[in-house]
Structures are given as structure tokens and as C-alpha cells.
Amino acid sequence: YRAFFTFGKTTDTLDSFGVLVEEKDFVFDKDAMKNALKSLEGVQMQIPPAYSALSVNGVRAYTLARKGVSPDLPPRRVEIYSLDLVRQVEEKVFCIDIECSGGTYVRSICRDVAQKLGTVGYMSGLIRIASGKFSTENACTLKEVEENPESCVLPLTEPLNEFPETIVEDRFYKDLSNGVKIPTN
């Protein structure tokens, strides 16, 4: 991911769509920022944001949060492979590159970095620059799509090449079509 973190203020959703709930002083110190980012690399237990799709007793956390109820969300195991400061965009806005495991909340990373810096923060922007073997580096530009769309379309089998082929018995077709787990061997 390429994320944009704004420090010195935060919102109820930990992103730019939320309501401002707190402001706190923030003065940029490059060494402190790099140390805060480095300290979050590795395996950790991360507390998800209150505004998330996780279920709490069958109810989405964001539903509870919208009603003013703080959902009790247990920490989840995540791994942050790297957190790199790319550049300072504005006085209190920073561009950060993040490589992390699935299930990691970038909004929570921002909150946690801010806490380590003695302030508050929210995620003011997010771009997914890679997913699996797909990345923005090998993506077509809009101009390329307009000029030669066929050259920008991958075969349907391309996204699945990294997975082993599995032959499924006919009797499992309906279950598989409906997303039900089926036995494999």
C-alpha cells in the first residue's frame, strides 16, 4: 500500500471520512518518525478500528460505532513486513509505503504510529499498489487502454496461474458455486 497519514488530528473512523474528534500538537522529527515506523514492523497483535466490518456478537462493529457504542474488538495477529517513509507531503501529512499481511488495518497502523509519536493521526489517503502478482508498475495507463484495449486484458487463467489445478467431482459443483468449502485431496 501507499498510505497518506495526517498527524495532529484524528477522526472517529481513523480516515478522512470521519468526524474530527481530537487535535493534538505535532512537530515532525524525521528520526522519531523512522523509529516509530521501524518499531511496528514484524508480527504483532493489532486492535482493529471501531469502524470496521468485523462482527461483534453477530453485529458489524461499524453498526455499533455509528450508534455511539464502542465495540469490543479483540486484537488480531498481523504482520507488517515493512513501513517506509517516502516523503513529507505537507507540514503534517506523510506518504508511507506499507507491506503487510492480509487482515491488517492501515488505519490502525496510522493510529499506532501517531501514538508512538505522542500525538493522534488518521489515514488521509490509501492506494493499493500491489496485490499478489499484480501491481501498478505493470498496469496499463488509461491512454493505453483507450488506444489498444486488447493488449491490456489478461487471459482469465492468468490470475490463477500461481494455484495448483484441482479437478472437482460433479457432485460438488453446486456447493462450490455457492462458496461452500468442499473436501480436497
Regions found by a protein language model. Give the residues of each.
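Short, conserved beta-turn/loop elements at beta-strand boundaries and strand-helix junctions
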Residues: 11, 42, 73-74, 87-91, ...
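Residue-level signal for inorganic ion chemistry
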Residues: 3, 58, 109, 176
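Short, surface-exposed recognition loops or helix-turn segments adjacent to catalytic cores
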Residues: 47-57, 125-130
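Accessory RNA 3′-end/elbow-binding domains used by RNA modification enzymes
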Residues: 4-6, 31-35, 93, 97, ...
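Short, acidic (Asp/Glu-rich) active-site segment that either coordinates a divalent metal cofactor
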Residues: 1-15, 72-73, 110, 119-125
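Acidic, low-complexity central loop/insert segments
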Residues: 1-45
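Extended alpha-helical targeting/anchoring segments
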Residues: 52, 56-81
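The conserved catalytic core of RNA pseudouridine synthases
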Residues: 71-118
